[in-house]
C-alpha cells in the first residue's frame, strides 16, 4: 500500500473525531462537493457486517514506519454508543450540495453523528417516493456479494484484510469486528465532452472503532455478477499521535490504480485536493439551515435531463435580447425546467398517470421556463404584468399573457395541475392560497427570492434566523395552513436563493374543504394585524373546490382558460352558501406596476450626469498626481492620474440639491460613478480616475474570441479623456477603444433577432 497524503489538523478543539466523520459523510453522500466532475452519489443500501479471521496470514504493511494510535471513531466516546447499524428496507439516495456550508451541515452533534455512522439514511421526505427507483439492489444479492468477499479475504487475500483493518506488520486483525457497510453508486456528470457516463458501484466499509473508511470498487464478471475489484481501492483514516490529529489517504496496490479523471481521479488529487477539503470540513462547526440539493428527485435522471435541455436550448444565449445576463438566466431556467420535468415524471409514475401535467407560471418574467416546459410536451402558459422583448421570439406554441394578477375569485385555475412561482415576488405567498382554492388536485412549486408578505414587504420577526431562512419558513407555514404537505429542496442553479418549496399533496380529505378554507381566511386576515375591511370588502371564507375524483388534467388550451366562477356557484348552490365577495381576498394588495421604474441613474438627464462626472473628475485631478508610463509605441508619456478619494469625501464636495437628486436613485452617487466606468473606478468605497493603459494590457491577455468581441465594440462612443482631460487621452488613437473625435465614431453593432422554433 502507499500513503498518498497526510495532513495534520490545526486547532481541532473538541470537534474531533466527530468532525472527521461529518467530513467523511460529505464525501460519501455528496462527493460532487469536492469532485466537480461528479453529479452526485446514490446510497443504495446500508448494513452491519463483520470481517472474518484470516486462515493464513502473510506479512502486512502499514501506512508508514511510525506507530500510530488510532483515533476513536463514532463508537468510542465521540457519538457515544447507540444501536448498531441495520440494513435498509429500501434503497436510499445520497443527495447533492453545491455549497460547503450546506454540505457540512450534517452530523455535527454527537447524537446526529451516531446516526450518520450507524443507522440508515433518512427518507427522501415524501411518502412512496424512495421505493422503486433506478438502481434497486436485491437483499439476497447483497448477502451473496458480501459473503463471497468475506470468504476471499479469509482464504487468501490477507493483504487486503490487513488494509481494511489497518493492522500493522505481523499483527492479526480482530475477529468478527462489527463494521458499517454501504453500497453506493457514484454518478458522473453527463456531458458531451466526457465519454464516461456510466455510474460506478462500490462498497464502502466504515470501521468506526478504528477510524477508517475504505472504498472498494465493484465490477461485473462474465456472468453478470458483481465482485470486488482489486484495483482503485483506497482508504481515508484518522489517527492520533502525541496529542495531534492526522488524516491520511492510502491506496491499496498503487500499481493497479487506473485513473479515469472522473470517478477515479489521480492519486495526487486524492492526497492533495480531497485531503485538504476533508481536513477543512473536519474542524468547521457549521450547521446548515437548508436541505441537501435535489433531495426530492433522482439525481441520475436529473443529470441526464439537464444536459439534454442544456444542449437543446444553448442557442438561446446567443440571441438573448434582454439586458440581463444570458448565461445566468438561460441555464438557471434550464435547470429549473429539468427539475420540474423529473418531478412530474416521477409523480406520473407514482400516481399511474399518462397525461402530462398542465401548469400556469405566475409572474413568468422572460417566459423561458414556460417555453421549455411547453416545448417538452406540458400544456401551460405564463402570466406576467409586463411583456418582455423575448416573448416575440418564442413562437405561437408558447402561451404568454400580459396581465396583472390580483388574488381573488377571478384568478383561480381549477383545471390546472401545477402553479409555478419562479421568483414571483409579491405573488409568492399567495401561490399556495391560489393553488388550494383552485381545486383539490392543484399543486404548487415556488422558488422564493424577494421577501413579500400578503401585503407589502415581509417584516422579520426572529433575529436568530437569517432573513432568507425565516421567509422560507413563512411560505412553508402558508402552505401548511392552506392544507398542503410542503416539501423543501435545494436546486442546482447559479443563484444564492435556490431553495424551492413543493406542495404535492393535501393534509385533509376533500370533504373538509370548507372548514380548511375558513382557516385559510383567518390566517390571511391575521397576518401583520390586517385592519377590518370596509363594507363590501369583507374577507369571507371562499369554499371553492373541485371534487377529488375529477381528472385534474388539462384537456387542451380551452380547459386552461376556464375560470372557477361556475364551480363556485355550483358549490354554493349545493351547500346553501351565500354569494361570495367579488373583491380581493385581502384589501390593500397591489400588483407591481406595468411600467418598471428605472432607478439606476440611467433615467437622469444627460446634462446632469455629464455635469456631475466633470465635477468629480476635476476634484480628483486637483491632486495633480502625475504618473509616467510607457505608451504602446515605447515612448514615455506623463499623464495626470489624479488622486483617490472616498465616496464620503466626494459627496461632501457636491451641493445639497445634487445629492438629493441622486439619493432618489438606487445606489445614488456610487451608482452614477460606476455607470461612468469609462472615467472612474470605484474600488472598496474609493473613487479613482481610470487608467486605460492598464485596461489595454488586460485586453491583450484575453482569448482571441473575447478580443474580437471587444474590438467590435470599439469607437462607438467618444473618448471622455480626449475631450476633457487636461493631458488628453493616455492612449494613442490606434489603441484607445473610444473615438478621438466625431470623425472616428462608428455605428454600434446590432444583433438581428431570430425566431425560436
Curated annotation (Swiss-Prot):
Keywords: Cytoplasm, Metal-binding, Methyltransferase, Phosphoprotein, S-adenosyl-L-methionine, Transferase, tRNA processing, Zinc, Zinc-finger. It is found in: Cytoplasm. Pfam families: AdoMet_MTase. The keyword Cytoplasm applies. Its main location: cytoplasm. A zinc finger (C3H1-type) spans 713-743. Residues 55-93, 108-138 are annotated as: Disordered. GO terms for molecular function: tRNA (uridine) methyltransferase activity; tRNA(Ser) (uridine(44)-2'-O-)-methyltransferase activity; zinc ion binding. The keyword Zinc-finger applies. Residues 123-136 have a biased composition (Basic and acidic residues). One of its GO terms (biological process) is tRNA methylation. The modification Phosphoserine is found at residues 78, 533. One of its GO terms (cellular component) is cytoplasm. It is an enzyme of class 2 (transferase). It catalyses: uridine(44) in tRNA(Ser) + S-adenosyl-L-methionine = 2'-O-methyluridine(44) in tRNA(Ser) + S-adenosyl-L-homocysteine + H(+). PROSITE patterns: ZF_C3H1 (PS50103). Residues 72-84 have a biased composition (Gly residues). Its EC number is 2.1.1.211. Belongs to the TRM44 family. Probable adenosyl-L-methionine (AdoMet)-dependent tRNA (uracil-O(2)-)-methyltransferase. This is Probable tRNA (uracil-O(2)-)-methyltransferase. It comes from Homo sapiens. The lineage of its organism: Eukaryota, Metazoa, Chordata, Craniata, Vertebrata. The gene is TRMT44.
Amino acid at each position: 500500500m502507499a500513503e498518498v497524503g497526510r495532513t495534520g489538523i490545526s486547532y481541532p478543539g473538541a470537534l474531533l473525531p466527530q468532525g472527521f466523520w461529518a467530513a467523511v459523510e460529505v464525501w460519501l453522500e455528496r462527493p460532487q462537493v469536492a469532485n466537480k466532475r461528479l453529479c452526485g452519489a446514490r446510497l443504495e443500501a446500508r448494513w452491519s457486517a463483520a470481517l472474518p479471521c484470516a486462515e493464513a496470514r502473510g506479512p502486512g504493511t502499514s501506512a508508514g514506519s511510525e506507530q500510530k494510535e488510532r483515533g476513536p471513531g463514532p463508537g468510542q466516546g465521540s457519538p457515544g454508543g447507540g444501536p448498531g447499524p441495520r440494513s435498509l428496507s429500501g434503497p436510499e439516495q445520497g443527495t447533492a450540495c453545491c455549497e460547503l456550508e450546506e454540505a457540512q451541515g450534517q452530523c455535527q452533534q454527537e447524537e446526529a453523528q451516531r446516526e450518520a455512522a450507524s443507522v440508515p439514511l433518512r427518507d427522501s421526505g415524501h411518502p412512496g417516493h424512495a421505493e422503486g427507483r433506478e438502481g434497486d439492489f436485491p437483499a439476497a444479492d447483497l448477502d451473496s456479494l458480501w459473503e463471497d468477499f468475506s470468504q476471499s479475504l479469509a482464504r487468501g487475500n490477507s493483504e487486503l484484510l490487513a488494509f481494511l483493518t489497518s493492522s500493522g506488520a505481523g499483527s492479526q486483525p480482530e475477529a468478527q469486528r462489527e463494521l458499517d457497510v454501504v453500497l453506493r453508486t457514484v454518478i458522473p456528470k453527463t456531458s458531451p465532452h466526457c465519454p464516461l457516463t456510466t455510474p460506478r458501484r462500490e462498497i464502502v466499509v466504515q470501521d468506526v472503532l478504528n477510524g477508517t473508511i475504505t472504498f472498494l470498487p465493484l465490477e461485473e464478471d462474465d456472468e453478470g455478477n458483481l465482485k470486488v475489484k482489486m484495483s482503485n481501492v483506497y482508504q481515508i483514516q484518522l489517527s492520533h499521535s502525541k496529542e495531534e490529529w492526522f488524516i491520511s489517504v492510502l491506496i491499496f496496490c498503487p500499481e493497479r490504480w487506473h485513473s479515469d479523471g472522473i470517478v477515479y481521479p489521480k492519486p495526487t488529487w486524492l492526497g492533495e485536493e480531497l485531503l485538504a477539503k476533508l481536513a477543512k470540513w473536519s474542524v468547521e462547526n457549521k450547521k446548515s439551515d437548508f436541505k441537501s440539493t435535489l433531495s426530492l428527485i433522482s439525481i441520475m435522471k436529473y443529470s441526464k435531463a439537464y444536459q439534454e435541455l442544456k444542449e437543446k436550448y444553448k442557442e438561446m444565449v446567443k440571441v438573448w435580447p434582454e439586458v440581463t445576463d444570458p448565461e445566468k438566466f438561460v441555464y438557471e431556467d434550464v435547470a429549473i425546467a429539468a427539475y420540474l420535468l423529473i418531478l412530474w415524471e416521477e409523480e406520473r409514475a407514482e400516481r399511474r398517470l399518462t397525461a402530462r401535467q398542465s401548469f400556469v407560471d405566475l409572474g413568468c418574467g422572460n417566459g423561458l421556463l414556460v417555453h421549455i416546459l411547453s416545448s417538452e410536451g406540458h400544456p401551460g402558459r405564463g402570466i406576467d404584468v409586463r411583456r418582455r422583448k423575448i416573448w416575440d421570439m418564442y413562437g405561437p406554441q408558447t402561451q404568454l399573457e400580459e396581465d396583472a394578477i390580483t388574488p381573488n375569485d377571478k384568478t383561480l385555475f381549477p383545471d390546472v395541475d401545477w402553479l409555478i412561482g419562479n421568483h414571483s415576488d409579491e405573488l409568492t405567498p399567495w401561490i399556495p392560497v391560489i393553488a388550494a382554492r383552485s381545486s383539490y388536485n392543484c399543486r404548487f412549486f415556488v422558488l422564493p427570492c424577494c421577501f413579500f408578505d400578503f401585503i407589502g414587504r415581509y417584516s422579520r420577526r426572529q433575529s436568530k434566523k437569517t432573513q432568507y431562512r425565516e421567509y422560507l419558513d413563512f411560505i412553508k407555514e402558508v402552505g401548511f395552513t392552506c392544507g398542503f404537505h410542503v416539501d423543501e429542496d435545494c436546486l442546482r442553479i447559479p443563484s444564492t436563493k435556490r431553495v424551492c418549496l413543493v406542495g404535492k399533496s393535501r393534509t385533509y380529505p376533500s370533504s373538509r374543504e370548507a372548514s380548511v378554507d375558513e382557516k385559510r381566511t383567518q390566517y390571511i386576515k391575521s397576518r401583520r394585524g390586517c385592519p377590518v375591511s370596509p363594507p363590501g370588502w369583507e374577507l369571507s371564507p371562499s369554499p371553492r373546490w373541485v371534487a377529488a375524483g375529477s381528472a385534474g388534467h388539462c384537456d387542451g388550451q380551452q380547459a386552461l382558460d376556464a375560470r372557477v366562477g361556475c364551480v363556485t356557484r355550483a358549490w354554493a348552490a349545493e351547500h346553501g352558501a351565500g354569494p361570495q365577495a367579488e373583491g380581493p381576498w385581502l384589501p390593500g394588495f397591489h400588483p407591481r406596476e406595468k411600467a418598471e421604474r428605472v432607478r439606476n441613474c440611467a433615467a437622469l438627464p444627460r446634462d446632469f450626469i455629464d455635469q456631475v462626472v466633470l465635477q468629480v473628475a476635476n476634484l480628483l485631478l486637483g491632486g495633480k498626481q502625475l504618473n509616467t508610463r510607457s505608451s504602446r509605441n515605447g515612448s514615455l508619456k506623463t499623464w495626470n492620474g489624479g488622486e483617490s478619494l472616498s465616496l464620503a469625501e466626494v459627496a461632501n464636495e457636491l451641493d445639497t440639491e445634487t445629492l438629493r437628486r441622486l439619493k432618489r436613485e438606487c445606489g445614488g452617487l456610487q451608482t452614477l460613478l460606476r455607470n461612468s466606468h469609462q472615467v472612474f473606478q470605484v474600488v472598496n468605497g474609493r473613487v479613482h480616475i481610470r487608467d486605460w493603459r492598464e485596461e489595454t494590457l488586460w485586453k491583450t491577455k484575453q482569448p482571441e474570441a473575447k478580443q474580437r468581441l471587444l474590438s467590435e465594440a470599439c469607437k462607438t462612443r467618444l473618448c471622455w479623456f480626449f475631450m476633457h482631460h487636461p493631458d488628453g487621452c493616455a492612449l494613442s488613437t490606434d489603441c484607445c477603444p473610444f473615438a478621438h473625435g466625431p470623425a472616428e465614431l462608428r455605428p454600434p453593432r446590432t444583433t438581428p433577432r431570430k425566431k425560436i422554433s
